[in-house]
């Protein structure tokens, strides 16, 4: 009996030491899924969290295990010291550590004031996963960023967010849900949230975002807000948040550096970018297929106040050449088919570091400008729903009060509203079918003088035109700015995650069939093509009707 009591007592206080844990003084900021399907959790200590007022790190309780000779987590190589600070400072949180569950006991961490502090070790990539949730009160003021779908060989990265070289926020992993697709392949849906996070010794209140973050910290600390000291400054070019296909190298930890300037790029799973040196040291990262040309780990970096971002170098693939049809030939299309065509060839988009491009010049891998929430960001083109330079189609052309025009097909979805309606956040809007928009309503467009803001532009006239060339790009956000107008990538169906997942698998299947029967290599420039109308009809049968706009 005494022996059983002893065993029971030991079991009641025993805590497993295996699995990846960020502990209570670091923050989960990245999640990599190895080719084997096992997750790797990345933990970081930014300037706003995990510090003692005297300037040294709080005790690090992060722990990681090795499974099949691969580590299941890592600590980002952050600075060991910072400047001392006062506990009543308005630029840093009074509470500098989270409170974590004693073990891996949660199926998800879906409370607003939680993040995923640890992941239970997996001996089998197909087993259910348990998480250790950590609670941190300031997260109640956090905002939702997006949900990233991460599969084997992919990684999602958050981290510091910058505006004009001043840090104002940090993107973290709030929740992870493991799922399996119809092919039996495991993927993870990763929730990314953002909370105010300043470098207390390099915080310029003249910048809107820094001023707003300081007031958020003041609110959390129970202090009064401050008034802004100066008007807004100009917006600098953003630094991308890309993804890396890599795995944990034997005997090393993976350290992925991620700095996001301006309002940040939407993290993507398949667009690979060259790593760049940030204010933290990089160590040990080796992509699965070798490092990008010219990549050198940065072992000596300047302090955060000397941060100088490098230029974004996306990997761009060459576009597929589409042969022209013989003169007078009109390809067969089902009734109503051309209504799904989307944009004409002469529609224009802003591409990061490449300027303005016509739609017929756009390539998969280009990062195009988009309005997101209350701000402007960039989002990569993932694939083409349709791309046919020779196809003639009927478009709806809107003549606008600023003297410009905006053209797209009848069933394409676009964001419009009554001009008198007060809209503060574009994420609160639902897109409308082009054919249902009337004269006198307003579109949303990026301000010419300040692209980080949006304004309304009224429709003065509507007419029908015929043009040659139809283009339907799909971005990671599901929308983009076309002729500076905020518009969806979709036709009819207003559900980006479902539609994107559906067509992504269709494109993958099409490429496999092409390779099998015609020995054509798969490529991301390919498009769904003439099967799009049929596929949309199938999608309408399996998607709830309230998600479809008519």
UniProtKB/Swiss-Prot annotation:
SMART domains: HintC, HintN
Gene Ontology CC, one term: plasma membrane
SUPFAM superfamilies on file: Hedgehog/intein (Hint) domain
Keyword check for Magnesium: no
Single GO molecular function: peptidase activity
UniProt site (Involved in auto-cleavage): 409
Record site: Cleavage: 342-343
GO terms of biological process kind: cell-cell signaling; intein-mediated protein splicing; protein autoprocessing; segment polarity determination; system development
Record's comment on post-translational modification: The C-terminal domain displays an autoproteolysis activity.
Pfam families (UniProt xref): Hint
Residues marked Essential for auto-cleavage (site): 412
Sequence similarity: Belongs to the hedgehog family.
Function: Intercellular signal essential for a variety of patterning events during development.
Protein name: Warthog protein 8
Origin species: Caenorhabditis elegans
